[in-house]
Amino acid sequence: MRQVTLDERTSLGEETSKKLRSNLPPGGWFPALRDLSWYITERNVVYIDLFLSPHLQKISIRAAWSRNNPDIPPAILPTLVPIISALPTSSLERISVSTNHLTMPWARFKDPLSSVILRCGPSFTEYDSPVPLSNAALDHLIHLPHLRTWRIHGPPPTYPASSLPLVFPPLRELTLGENAACGWLPLLKRLEEGASTTQRMTPLSKAKEFLKVLKIEDVFGINIGASFVSAVQRFRNLVSLRVCVYCHDRDDRGKCIFELNDDNVTELAMALTQLESLVLGYPCSENTCLTTVTCLLPISVHCSKLNRLSIHFNATNIADDLRNILENPRFQQLRSLPRCPLAFLDVYRMPLGLHGSDLEIVVKGMIDIFPSLAHCEGVEEGWEEFSGMIGDLQGYSK
């Protein structure tokens, strides 16, 4: 057997598990097991070691507890930690850890999981886990030549300028989770700018070529401004960029951390021309940000493959801004170029409050920017009428 899935319904029973343990053959019950998906519960955690194989390549751990009983069972952690520490690593390729528990004490797993990572070899390709790792484990991952998927939580190791890593893995997907972006984005910039060689190769050369998906799930400690654009735009082959920013995300001055303006967004769009999905913050419900509907035109023109968009922008003067796009000569050349195939626009809680002729101007302006637009999803006043008017003007009913 090469694949086993243990879920919340799996229970061998106490007698059966005792017999399995007492009669455990020298090579284990599953000597050829390659892929183990393990949904941890009080019932199955005590015999999970019976399913481990020295040839294990992929392990997915999900700590799933009942919503009716959200407290972590006290017996789970002391049992689980030593089992994780003992995971075989000679052929391990993938570690995935997740939970439905909002207060999972991930720090308890830092040392055992770090010890596992430090034993992983060059065949390791994926680390997808909210468990923080030691500096040594992080440095080890940085030097793994075939790492493709990495979810990072916490800051990077501290590297003096004279000892920056000379390599960085050829990642295809990078997720910056809790407290990660504020440290890792500057490090990536340092790797690119401070370690260039006469061969024009840098530690980021392969990552710049291969990275397709970048997700920033936690913006704590950073401002989404010009320096953010500078750090991200180097990954020119991205097909998906997701930056989770809301109006209530504030810096220590009480200001919204989303500081991009229309020119910044244009610069980003001109760099990331392969994007198919762009979530650049969630639409602003307070209309306080500097970006306006004007930035949507360069996005539509330069990101010609885009089919999903959500962006933080100010709709206070949306009708006037759209008139400006239609009438201002400086937009004439852009308006003559083909647009992206975007059909759906998520406007979240962005206020609109327009009706009648003013609303029609906005709808026509948005269709001019996104000719394939079929629907706008918004909960505030005016957006339902907006979507209905799109259908009328595009020649079909919604």
Task: Report residues per predicted region.
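Leucine-rich repeat
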Residues: 1-398
